[in-house]
Amino acid sequence: MAERIQKLLSQWGIASRRHAEEMILAGRVSVNGKVANLGDKADPQQDFLSVDGKQIKADNRPRDIYLLVNKPRDVLSTCDDPRGRKTVLDLLPQDLQRGKGLHPVGRLDRNSTGALLLTNDGELTLRLTHPRYHLPKTYDVWLEGNPSDEDLEKWRSGMMLDGKKTLPATLEVISENKDQIHLLVTLTEGRNRQIRRLAEELGLTVLKLHRRTIGPLQLHTRGKVLGSGQFRFLSPAEIRLLKKQVNLR
């Protein structure tokens, strides 16, 4: 299957996608003997892809890797940052940070914590981030203030965001007092900063946001707790379940 060249180079562990774009612009990448342009696509099973004159073969692709990370606060959900801030790849050992093509699937904003999937499986990433597949994700949300029952029902039923109504959500009140409330929120879509923006629409402030689960993936499983900043490899059963939810074998 033909894919954008910068994506292939990232999946092959040659460079991050941003660096791969720079390599293409610098004329260092060729497809079938011709210098590639940004936006070009290639099929590694059919095309000859070269970097600095060295051919990249289809069987050079690293094995598929699937990791679950418990992202701490103040860590970016990206592969690299031009300002030198800490990213989720910095949480991994050196042998996983480079050369494997790992990237986060979706994002948690800088101030949010919790479950984040990292993989180099491009097809799985594409499906998990496609609006067609409504993979449920569950969050602990601490809010300043006390929303009314009517506000919570609005959130559950769906609210307008960027001119489009959000999908229904599940909200469970865990605890509350006169100053704040702790909710368990399950979403089946992933719009940019969705929980924080919906809270703002209701006049509420998010004090803390922590993602517990991504589909079948849980931070706490098999009697073990994945601590902040730690990661683990997914089990074969978890990989199968995750792929099944997006119709991928």
Curated annotation (Swiss-Prot):
One of its GO terms (biological process) is enzyme-directed rRNA pseudouridine synthesis. The keyword Secreted does not apply. GO terms for molecular function: RNA binding; rRNA pseudouridine synthase activity. InterPro entries: PsdUridine_s_RsuA/RluB/E/F_cat, PsdUridine_synth_cat_dom_sf, PsdUridine_synth_RsuA/RluA, PsdUridine_synth_RsuA/RluB/E/F, PsdUridine_synth_RsuA/RluB_CS, RsuA_PseudoU_synthase, S4_RNA-bd, S4_RNA-bd_sf. It comes from the Bacteria. The active site is at D109. It holds the Pfam family PseudoU_synth_2. Disulfide bonds: none annotated. It catalyses: a uridine in RNA = a pseudouridine in RNA. Its EC number is 5.4.99.-. NCBIfam families: pseudouridine synthase (TIGR00093). This is Uncharacterized RNA pseudouridine synthase slr0361. It comes from Synechocystis sp. (strain ATCC 27184 / PCC 6803 / Kazusa).
